[in-house]
């Protein structure tokens, strides 16, 4: 059976700047891929191509057996690909419940009765049910991050693209978020860009390293993080450091 996501020989450049240099990857449901690399490595550009924000110059993106390169960005959520951002973007004047309900209605395209039920289920799953009637703009940062995930889940996404979602949190909050993301693997495929290696290591089944738009490594987190090349280009440590 084909993988949920199949990216083949993806290429993108802006003049002399290469952001995707023949990138290929596959991802199945219930698998988390941690995506790391220095700033400018092409991580966000890869997400932008997966979500249709930018078009690749070449290569193929297949999702759930379908070539999605012609699917417009605003329709990718209906296909099943949703991105959660580093800086949460809730509708601040709406309640937490209304934010999630909106995602269920317009992201998933559910009818109102089903959307209402699904929104409550999602709030419970993400630990936000007790905040359902609170204005989203009044949430603390960790709960705004939870809401970002809740909206993605409510849209019935199959693939979650997490873009540095743990950024700005305390260590304790990071590990709370890790627990939630780990629980989401049971029903989703996840690609997670993050600069907190131990958080990724706690969730990811694989890690992929990008550098100047090229895939350098793809393998078990322990092997990738122990690589002398990764230690040098990503962590800024000498390749032979203990």
Sequence positions of predicted segments:
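Glycine-rich phosphate-binding loops of nucleotide-dependent enzymes
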Residues: 2-242
């Amino acid at each position: 059976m084909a993988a949920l996501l199949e990216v083949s020989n993806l290429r993108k450049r802006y003049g002399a700047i290469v952001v995707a240099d023949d990138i290929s990857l596959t991802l199945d449901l219930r698998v988390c891929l941690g995506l790391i690399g220095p700033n400018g490595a092409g991580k966000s550009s890869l997400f932008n191509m997966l979500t249709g924000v930018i078009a690749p110059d070449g290569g193929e993106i297949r999702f759930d057996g379908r070539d999605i390169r012609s699917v417009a960005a605003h329709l990718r959520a209906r296909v099943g690909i949703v991105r959660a951002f580093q800086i949460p973007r809730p509708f601040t004047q709406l309640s937490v419940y209304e934010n999630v309900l909106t995602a269920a209605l317009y992201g998933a395209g559910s009818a109102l009765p089903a959307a209402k039920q699904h929104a409550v289920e999602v709030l419970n799953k993400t630990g936000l049910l007790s905040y359902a009637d609170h204005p989203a703009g009044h949430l603390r940062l960790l709960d705004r991050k939870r809401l970002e995930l809740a909206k993605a889940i409510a849209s019935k996404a199959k693939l979650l693209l997490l873009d540095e979602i743990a950024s700005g949190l305390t260590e304790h909050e990071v590990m709370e978020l890790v627990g939630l993301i780990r629980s989401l693997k049971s029903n989703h495929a996840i690609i997670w860009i993050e600069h907190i290696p131990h958080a990724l290591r706690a969730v990811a089944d694989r890690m992929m390293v990008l550098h100047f738009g090229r895939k350098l490594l793809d393998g078990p987190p322990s092997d990738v993080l122990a690589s002398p090349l990764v230690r040098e280009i990503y962590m800024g440590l000498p390749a032979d450091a203990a």
